[in-house]
UniProtKB/Swiss-Prot annotation:
It comes from Endomicrobium trichonymphae. One of its GO terms (biological process) is ribosome disassembly. Catalyzes the GTP-dependent ribosomal translocation step during translation elongation. During this step, the ribosome changes from the pre-translocational (PRE) to the post-translocational (POST) state as the newly formed A-site-bound peptidyl-tRNA and P-site-bound deacylated tRNA move to the P and E sites, respectively. Catalyzes the coordinated movement of the two tRNA molecules, the mRNA and conformational changes in the ribosome. PROSITE patterns: G_TR_1 (PS00301), G_TR_2 (PS51722). It is found in: Cytoplasm. The keyword GTP-binding applies. This is Elongation factor G. The keyword Hydrolase does not apply.
C-alpha cells in the first residue's frame, strides 16, 4: 500500500502521567478536535473511547494501553493512551519502548507525583523526547510555575515554558504563546473547538515579555542562530525559535511546557501544534541498532520503507472475534498481509494472515504497513511480548524490554471440575497478554499461585477471568511475593542414573552457583570443554535449573539473582538423554543452593504519604513501626509530603490506619522499588509459617 504521509509528517507518541492527572480526558479531546470522534466521551460517565474495557468504565481508570490514530493539520498521529496507576506500569514500559515521543500530563495543582517520576524514568531509559502538558489549570490551587519548578527539582530536567497561562483556577481563560507572542482565548462555547487569537492582554504584557526573554536565553545555549541574534540584539523569528526548541527537545536537553484544562476544553489544540513542532518523527530517531542473530555482531536498520523489514511485538491482546492480536511497531521496511516473517528469538517463521489498525478496541483492516507504523497482526501463534519480527534473509534482533518482578501472590482454585480446564486456559491467555502476571504451582500444597504488581492488578485479572472466560474461582488473601537468593559461591555435583531393564537414564552435572547483584536476575554460563557433556544436552541442564528456581530450598519461594556455571560432568553413549540431564541439572542446582547460605528477600515499596502538617508526627511514627526508612520530607502549602521505603509485608491495611491517624485527610501511593534481605527475626517467622502450613 502506498504511503499516505511522508515519514517526516508522522508522529508516534504516548500520553502518560500519574493517575487522575487527566491523560484519558486529554486524549478524548485530541480525538474530538482532530475529527476522529464526533462527540467527547467523558471518563467519569464511563464513556471514554480509549477506556473500552468494562473494568475501566466502572472504575474510571485506564488499565490497558489503547492505541489509536488521527490526523492533525498535515500530520498523521499514532497515539497510545497509557494507564496512570502504578499496578499497570508494564503497560507504560512497553508503550514507551516503541514510541518516538511522549506528552507527559501533570496536574497543575499537584505538580510532579510519584507515578509521574516512574514514567519519567521509563522515558529516560528509552531516550524518549517529551513535552509536558500542565493540565487542570481551572482547579483550586492550580499553579503553572510550581509544575515548572517541580520538573526541574524532582526530575532533574530542564523545563522551558513555551506558554504562560491567562488567569488560573476559575478565571483561567487561555494561554499566551511565547513564541508568537499571541494570546489564545477560549470563550467556552462549541466544546472548545473554536478560540480567538488576539494580542497579549495589556495586564500580562510585562510578564509575557519577561517570560519570553527567559525562554530565548535558555534556548540560546543550544542554538548558534539564536545566540548570534541575542548577542547582536536582533529579534529571532518564530521559525528560528521553534527549530531551536525542536533540536533541544529531540536531544532531551529541554522539555517544552504547555498548559490548559482538557476537561474545560482549553489549551489542547496548541498542545497538538507543539507535538508537530517539537516531538520527533520516525526519521529523527536515526538508524535503529540491533544484533545480528547469526554472527552476534551489532547491526542496524535504516528508517526506510526500502530497508529490510524489522518490527517489535510490544503487546499481545486476546480478541474475542479474531483471536490473538499482536501489536507491532514497524522500524524498517514494509509488511504485507499474507506474508511470512521470521522470529529470531523463537527461530521460527510465522505467517501474518491479516493486519489491522486499531482505534481503541475497533479494528480497520489494511493490506500493508510501512516504516514508522503501529498496527496489530493476526495469525502469529508463537510470538510473545518483546520479540523481534524481521526478514529471514536479513535477520536482526532488536532491543527487547524489561518488566518489573511481581510483588503480590494470591492462591486461586477453580470452584468446580468444569471450571478447572477453563481456569487453565484463562491463566495461560492472561499471562501471555501481561508480562507482569505470573502463574506457578506451589510444590508443597499443589496450589496454583498467581502473582502481580498489586492488589488492584490481581483484582482486575480475576474479574476478567470471570467475565471473559466465565471461570468461577476461589481466591485467597493477597500474600507478599517473597524471593530466595544465595550469599556465597558453592559447587555441587549430581548424577542421575536409572537402570530398569532396557535403555537406562544417565546424566552427570557439576556446577557452581554464585550470588548476582540485586535485580540482575538469572545467568547461565556453559564452561564445558572437550565435550564431556555433548552440546545438545546443555539446554536441558538450563531448563532443569530454571524449573528448580521456581521453588527455593529454604521456604519454597522462587529463586532470584543467581549465576550458574556448568563446569564438568559426564555422559553415557546409550543411556544419556535430555531428560536425564534436565533432572541432574535441577538436582545439582538445589544441592548447591542448600549449601550456599540461602536467604529470603522481600519487596520494598517506594511510598509517598501526603498529610496535613499536624498529623506528621503520628504518621512518621507509624511508618517507623512498619520497618519503614524515611527518605525525605517536604512541606508544600501546609501539607507534608513524606517519602519512605517500607516493606510491602507491613503495608497491608495501611489505608485504614492512615485514615484513622489523619481523620480521613491523608492519602498515599506506593510502587515496587527493590528487593532486600529479610531481617533474621522476620525470616524465622516466615519459615515457621511455611513449614507449619
Amino acid at each position: 500500500m502506498a504511503r499516505e504521509y511522508p515519514l517526516n509528517k508522522v508522529r508516534n507518541f504516548g500520553i502518560a502521567a500519574h493517575i487522575d492527572a487527566g491523560k484519558t480526558t486529554t486524549t478524548e479531546r485530541i480525538l474530538y478536535y482532530t475529527g476522529r470522534t464526533h462527540k467527547i466521551g467523558e471518563v467519569h460517565e464511563g464513556a471514554a473511547t480509549m477506556d473500552w474495557m468494562e473494568q475501566e468504565k466502572e472504575r474510571g481508570i485506564t488499565i490497558t494501553s489503547a492505541a489509536t490514530y488521527c490526523r492533525w493539520q498535515d500530520m498523521q498521529f499514532n497515539i497510545i493512551d497509557t494507564p496512570g496507576h502504578v499496578d499497570f506500569t508494564a503497560e507504560v514500559e512497553r508503550s514507551l519502548r516503541v514510541l518516538d515521543g511522549a506528552v507527559v500530563v501533570f496536574d497543575s495543582g499537584n505538580g510532579v507525583e510519584p507515578q509521574s517520576e516512574t514514567v519519567w524514568r521509563q522515558a529516560d531509559k528509552y531516550g524518549v523526547p517529551r513535552i509536558v502538558f500542565s493540565n487542570k489549570m481551572d482547579k483550586v490551587g492550580a499553579d503553572f510555575f510550581m509544575v515548572v519548578n517541580d520538573i526541574e527539582e524532582k526530575l532533574g530536567a530542564k523545563p522551558i515554558p513555551v506558554q504562560i497561562p491567562i488567569g488560573a483556577e476559575s478565571s483561567f481563560q487561555g494561554i499566551v504563546d511565547l513564541v508568537t507572542m499571541k494570546a489564545h482565548i477560549w470563550s467556552g462555547e462549541e466544546l472548545g473547538a473554536k478560540f480567538d487569537i488576539t494580542d497579549v492582554p495589556k495586564e500580562l504584557e510585562e510578564k509575557a515579555h519577561a517570560a519570553r526573554s527567559e525562554m530565548i536565553e535558555l534556548i540560546a545555549d543550544y542554538s548558534d542562530d539564536i545566540m548570534n541574534n541575542f548577542m547582536e540584539g536582533k529579534e529571532s523569528t518564530a521559525v528560528q525559535i521553534k527549530q531551536a526548541i525542536r533540536n533541544a527537545t529531540l536531544q532531551i536537553k529541554l522539555i517544552p511546557v504547555l498548559c490548559g484544562t482538557a476537561f474545560k476544553n482549553k489549551g489542547v489544540q496548541p498542545m497538538l501544534d507543539a507535538v508537530c513542532d517539537y516531538l520527533p518523527s520516525p526519521l529523527d530517531r536515526k538508524a535503529f541498532k540491533g544484533i545480528n542473530p547469526v554472527t552476534s555482531e551489532t547491526d542496524s536498520r535504516e528508517v526506510d520503507d526500502k530497508a529490510p523489514f524489522s518490527a517489535l511485538a510490544f503487546k499481545i491482546q486476546a480478541d474475542p472475534y479474531i483471536g490473538k492480536l499482536t501489536y507491532l511497531r514497524v522500524y524498517s521496511g514494509t509488511l504485507e498481509s499474507g506474508s511470512y516473517v521470521y522470529n529470531p528469538i523463537k527461530d521460527a517463521k510465522e505467517r501474518i494472515s491479516r493486519i489491522v489498525r486499531m482505534h481503541s478496541n475497533n479494528r480497520e483492516e489494511v493490506k500493508s504497513v510501512n516504516t514508522g507504523d503501529i498496527a496489530a497482526a493476526v495469525g502469529l501463534k508463537n510470538t510473545g511480548t518483546g520479540d523481534t519480527l524481521c526478514d529471514e534473509e536479513k535477520p536482526i534482533l532488536l532491543e527487547s524490554m524489561d518488566f518489573p518482578v511481581p510483588v503480590i501472590d494470591v492462591a486461586i482454585e477453580p470452584k468446580s471440575k468444569a471450571d478447572e480446564e477453563k481456569l487453565g486456559i484463562a491463566l495461560n491467555r492472561l499471562s501471555e497478554e501481561d508480562p507482569t502476571f505470573r502463574v506457578r504451582t506451589n510444590e508443597e500444597t499443589n496450589q496454583t499461585i498467581i502473582a502481580g504488581m498489586g492488589e488492584l492488578h490481581l483484582e482486575i485479572l480475576v474479574d476478567r477471568m470471570k467475565r471473559e472466560f466465565n471461570v468461577q474461582a476461589n481466591v485467597g488473601r493477597p500474600q507478599v511475593a517473597y524471593r530466595e537468593t544465595i550469599r556465597k559461591v558453592q559447587e555441587a555435583e549430581s548424577k542421575y542414573i536409572r537402570q530398569t531393564g532396557g535403555r537406562g537414564q544417565y546424566g552427570h552435572v557439576v556446577l557452581t552457583v554464585e550470588p548476582q547483584d540485586p535485580g540482575k536476575g538469572y545467568e547461565f554460563v556453559n564452561k564445558i570443554v572437550g565435550g564431556v557433556i555433548p552440546r545438545e544436552y546443555i539446554p536441558a541442564i538450563d531448563k532443569g535449573i530454571k524449573e528448580a528456581m521456581t521453588s527455593g530450598t529454604l521456604a519454597g519461594y522462587p529463586v532470584a539473582d543467581v549465576k550458574v556455571v556448568v563446569i564438568d560432568g559426564s555422559f553415557h553413549e546409550v543411556d544419556s538423554s535430555e531428560m536425564a540431564f534436565k533432572i541432574a541439572g535441577s538436582m545439582a542446582f538445589k544441592d548447591a543452593c542448600r549449601k550456599a547460605s540461602p536467604v529470603i528477600l522481600e519487596p520494598i515499596m517506594k511510598t509517598e504519604v501526603i498529610v496535613p502538617e499536624e498529623y506528621m508526627g503520628d504518621v512518621i511514627g507509624d511508618l517507623n513501626s512498619r520497618r519503614g526508612k524515611i527518605v525525605s520530607m517536604e512541606s508544600k502549602n501546609k501539607v507534608q509530603h513524606i517519602k519512605a521505603n517500607v516493606p510491602l509485608a507491613e503495608m497491608f491495611g495501611y489505608s485504614t490506619t492512615l485514615r484513622s491517624l489523619t481523620q480521613g485527610r491523608g492519602n498515599y501511593s506506593m510502587e515496587p522499588s527493590h528487593y532486600e534481605e529479610v531481617p533474621s527475626q522476620i525470616a524465622d517467622k516466615i519459615l515457621e509459617r511455611t513449614t507449619r502450613g
